[in-house]
């Protein structure tokens, strides 16, 4: 009965949180932006900037409103942390760059032309950053956060990662075989777990957004598919082709589906999980090791509830 009541509470919170997020973003796109366009004359480029910045601002406001209004707590995960954000971006870019360098060295990826820096890349970078932040707000901030406070860090991580993976399968489902889609599903779960662990270790949405965006933009710069999307490849400094089987190159989904990348991501996730299990002493439902805490286990509806034992994997 208790678990059923908890599940109902989780479902209600998710409905409220995502209704706020969706409503804020759509309200800006369908109501506020057209009103601004009526009042002020702007060219296509300026309108695009206003649209992206407005969507971002509304999403952040919706998240802030949910946390302050429904969770009744400070929004610590949106506090600025310049050094940690920089480190997150460097870690994200370096991780996927290492995998792609190996794939280029093995001949799985071949650069066919050097186009140099393209004028549209700055706009792509901004779009990637906004998309990464929206995903982090939705998946790590809301979905993972609500699940974690109900059932603990590790169950929440895997549940959220399954949803994250499922939502990305559509990117390449019409161009991939069943085996390739299964590989993509596993890759998506691992990436969801990786970004969850980055968030768990930092408790900062800006840091995990920087990691996520830098990871994605590095893939774009190499001229290979990004999560099954080819839209930005013509703007990449490198024109690249993938040659070889799907397990080696990632095929139409890109380097995230390559076995090498999946192995690296899995190793990072396992290392962070083990480090957390060995070092995180749980006190009042929240770790005392890092600021704001790392792990929550069986915290129920009160993240500052009774002390819990050390996490056991």
Residue ranges: model-predicted function:
Residues 1-6, 28-90, 102-119, 143, ...:
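Membrane-helix interface linkers and caps
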Residues 2, 13-14, 18, 121-305, ...:
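Transmembrane helix-loop-helix hairpins at the membrane interface
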Residues 89-102, 128-129, 133:
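Mid-bilayer segments of alpha-helical transmembrane spans in multi-pass integral membrane proteins
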Residues 100-110, 164-173:
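C-terminal ends of transmembrane alpha-helices
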